[in-house]
Amino acid sequence: MASSGDSSGKQRSDEEWRAVLSPEQFRILRLKGTELPGTGEYNKFYGDGVYNCAGCGTPLYKSTTKFDSGCGWPAFFEGLPGAINRTPDPDGRRVEITCAACGGHLGHVFKGEGFKTPTDERHCVNSVSIKFTPAS
């Protein structure tokens, strides 16, 4: 599977991705895998800063949009403007979210679940797909 993304120089071949990502990062970011619930580094982490794409470093989420949904994965109620693409799964049951810059698989977004957030959305994100940068 060829990587997708824009023309900002963040597109790479699978061989290039394998050289810069861990096997688990490649499985999730490039092959659209999912980490086991409750196992991710950022599931219960609430530091002040920004979450970036683990593949290309693009900022994706502010820490102020992270909340505890109890789903077993990091949850955010919105991404940074233009940072995340949404693609309905072929079965129409879920909407996949990917990094707009490199096409890396982040997880899925769910709407209308009743969470008391400004958007009533839950971006259910694999910890392996993101990297936290603390506020300075």
Curated annotation (Swiss-Prot):
- Which cofactor(s) are needed, names only? Zn(2+)
Cystine pairs: C71-C124
**Source gene?**
MSRB5
Query: Protein name, please?
Result: Peptide methionine sulfoxide reductase B5
Binding of Zn(2+): at which residues?
Answer: C53, C56, C99, C102
Which transformation does this protein catalyse, written as a reaction?
Answer: L-methionyl-[protein] + [thioredoxin]-disulfide + H2O = L-methionyl-(R)-S-oxide-[protein] + [thioredoxin]-dithiol
For the MsrB domain, which residue ranges apply? 14-135
- The record's active-site residues are C124
Q: Which family does it belong to?
A: Belongs to the MsrB Met sulfoxide reductase family.
